[in-house]
Every structure is written in structure tokens, then in C-alpha cells.
């Protein structure tokens, strides 16, 4: 029996692309996961609680984040065919987003390249479907080696590939990004992918102070040497009210980094909503450092932090999608408005969609454009 046949096959079911509630801030709030769940076990993962909460609510036997489910490429093809044949329906934001060619983000809440992708080829099959339409796609992963294994099939495709890597030290990463391949292996894969012509964005999300500041020069120099096109950053957040499980996670992170991460937040951070975040002063200092290093090493730099300021970063498309062919963004988002001269084309049709896809039912009869304007006024 072949190795492929002997392996257990992942459970498959179709879920369609969807618009996220981040449209007030993000110019590309459109995502599609090829898998659900993740085996990489990063201690700072924001998607873990979202996934496990959703599974508890659906009575799925409290399946943990590490339990993988696969999407159905055949279902995706049917959805696309139906969407392309339909008229604009502003009660279905995901349909309008697709028809307007807003880039679809693959890997927003689940890595599209788990080890099983080597034989399941779910992400591969989905990418082939998008590729036939030359549809703009942004991919986020911690395992570019899997994509590298079949990357030659996508040379010249309308793809922006993001590789997530918050650390440049293998020993530290091994303790915090527990199941992911080492940074050195990621850098090696980036080098090979860049040789094939892929423009690679490295996501330093999150940056963790003061560690990230100390290694910044060495880190960005390494990215330049391995052929990355750009990098993007966002500061770490911690919930103010944390469970015992979360406190143990912070303890593990502290042990790996050699200082008390939570104590640093309490001393130098601020509370924003329900999260502890770095102060504006510390963020600006870090963003200024990254801006300088990007120029020093010939890279583009994008700021993905909620501290949005046109002085930091090369534009509003912080996930490195600006070079994608024939795409639009949501120009009414805060980030897009901060970079009005970026040259990006805004989708006015997307702004007409009803916000009936969020848990806040008070806004279900309002449009994306209306809610975005309200957000802008309330944040002044």
C-alpha cells in the first residue's frame, strides 16, 4: 500500500469565502480558509480561541484547535460559478467582494499549508481554481516549504505570499512557535521562492518588545539577504482579563525570551478595549526603527498595527497585495483613508453591501460605507 493511501484522510466540507468584521480598518476584509484548525501551536495565536469557541457552539465535541478539517475545492468551484453567473446582491457582501475582485486572503485563521497538505492538496486545488480566473490571492503561512514543493505550478500566478515569522532565533521560536518549522528553514524557503519570482512578504506579527527591538537590524538584514520583497509588523496584544491557561502561556513565552512579558506590559503598556497593548510612544519608536531598516536594506515596509499613520509604511495594503493584477480594495477603511495617494482602486460597490454578517445585529440594516463612516467619526 502506498504511503498516500495508508494515511488517514482529513474530513472535508465546504465553507464559502466571507467578509470579516474588520472592514472599518482593513482595506481587504475578504478571507477564505482552506483548512480549519492548526497544528503549529503558536503560544500567541489569536485564532485558537475563536476556533475552539465556534466548535463548542456547534456541538462538535469541543474539538481543539489542533483538530484539522479540510475545505472542499469542488464546493468552491460551484460557489464561484454561481457567484459569477449572479447579479450584484448587496445582502451578500462575499458575493460582491468576489465580483469586485477584492483579493481573497487564504490563511487568515488557519494555516493553508499543514503537513497533510502534502498529500491532501486541498490548498493546491483551490489555488488552481483561483488561478484559472487570474483571481488575486494573498496567502499567509508559517510553512512555505509545503508551497515550495509545488510552487513551480504557480509561477506567474496572481499570488501574494506572506510568510509569518516573529523571531530570527531558532531556539526561541522552537519554544513559542512550537509546531512550526524553524525560522532558518523559513528563510531558506523564502530564498528559493524568490528565485522563482514570487514576491514574499514576511509578517512580523506580532513584534514583542523589547526582544524585537534588540534583534531588528539582524532580522531585517536576514530578510533582505534571503530575497524577501517586504515585511509587515504589528505589536503583541494580551487580554486584560486572562484565564489560568493564558497566564501559563505568558509564563512560557517569558521563559523563552528571558524576561517577564506580562510585567513589561504592566509597566510600559496601556489598556485599549479589553487588551493590553504597547504605548503609542513605544509603538512609534519601533515603527520608526522598522522604517529606517527597510530603507537601509532595500525592502518595502508595511505597518499592520492599529496605530495607523502614513509616516509608517509604504501604503494601505499591509499584507503585500499592491502588485496583484486587476484588483480593488475597500477605500472607506481607516487604513486606506490614511494612504489616499497609494494608487489603489476602491470598490464603491462593496461599500453598498449590508453589514448582516457580524454578531452586532444593530448594524444589520446599515451598509459597509455607513458603518465605516460611523467608525471614523467615533475614533476622532
Stretch-by-stretch model annotation:
Residues 77-84, 124-127, 151, 186-191, ...:
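Generic structural signal for well-ordered alpha-helices
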Residues 131, 155, 194-195, 224, ...:
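Anion (oxyanion) recognition and catalysis
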